[in-house]
Amino acid sequence: MAKLTKRQKAIAEKIEAGKSYNFVDAAALLTELSTVKFSESIDVAVNLGVDPRKSDQVVRSATVLPHGTGKTVRVAVFTQGPAAEAALAAGADRVGMDDLAAEMKAGDLNYDVVIASPDAMRVVGQLGQVLGPRGLMPNPKVGTVTPDVATAVKNAKAGQVRYRTDKNGIIHTSVGKVGFDAVKLKENVEALIADLKRIKPASSKGIYVKRITLSTTMGPGLVIDQGSLEA
C-alpha cells in the first residue's frame, strides 16, 4: 500500500468518512486544507436523478452566480452593426465577424466564452472543429446564441457558469475560489441548485438532487448536508 504524503495525512485526519457537512463548515474546512501556492477554485458536483442516456433527461443550462466565480473571463462576440457596439460597451474583449473567425482558425483562442448573434452563425458554423472540442461553440441552450449579445456579455463577465450532465448524470462547475466569504459561496451554490430544480426534466422520477459535493481543485470532496442550503 502506497504511503500517504504529509498533505494526504493531514486531510485524512480532518475529514470524517461518511459525514454530510453543513455548507459553511465545509467551506471553512476546504479553505483550511488548501495549502497550494495558487488560489484554488472551489467546485461543486451535483448528482441528479436523471438518466443521461435519454435525450429528454440531459440537463444543460447556464446560471449567473450572484457573487461570480472570482475568475477573469475573456469574451469574444460574433456580431455586427449596432449589436457590435453594444457588445463592446458591455465589456467584450473582442468583437468581429469573418476577421475574428480567421484569427480563431489561426489559433488565437484565448477566450473563456464565445457569444454569437443569430445572424452571425453562418460565420461561426465554420468553426465547429475549432470551438467544439474546447467547449466554446455558441449554443442557444446556454444563452450564447442570442440577439441580445450585450446582456450575454454582461452575464459572462459577472460569473455565469455553463454546465451539462455527464454520462453519470452529474453536473460539475466552479462556484468561487478559496478565500471567498462562505456565505457568498453558499449563495452561489443555492442559485445553482434553484436553477437546476427549475429546469428539472419532466420525465425525471424520484429524488432529483441526490447528492452535492464541494471540493477544491487539488483537495478532497465533502458531501454537503442539503438541509443547510436554502434552495
Swiss-Prot record:
This is Large ribosomal subunit protein uL1. PROSITE patterns: RIBOSOMAL_L1 (PS01199). The lineage of its organism: Bacteria, Pseudomonadati, Pseudomonadota, Gammaproteobacteria, Pseudomonadales. GO terms for molecular function: rRNA binding; structural constituent of ribosome; tRNA binding. PANTHER family: 54S RIBOSOMAL PROTEIN L1, MITOCHONDRIAL, LARGE RIBOSOMAL SUBUNIT PROTEIN UL1M. One of its GO terms (cellular component) is cytosolic large ribosomal subunit. Keywords: Repressor, Ribonucleoprotein, Ribosomal protein, RNA-binding, rRNA-binding, Translation regulation, tRNA-binding. InterPro entries: Ribosom_uL1_bac-type, Ribosomal_uL1, Ribosomal_uL1-like, Ribosomal_uL1/biogenesis, Ribosomal_uL1_3-a/b-sand, Ribosomal_uL1_CS.
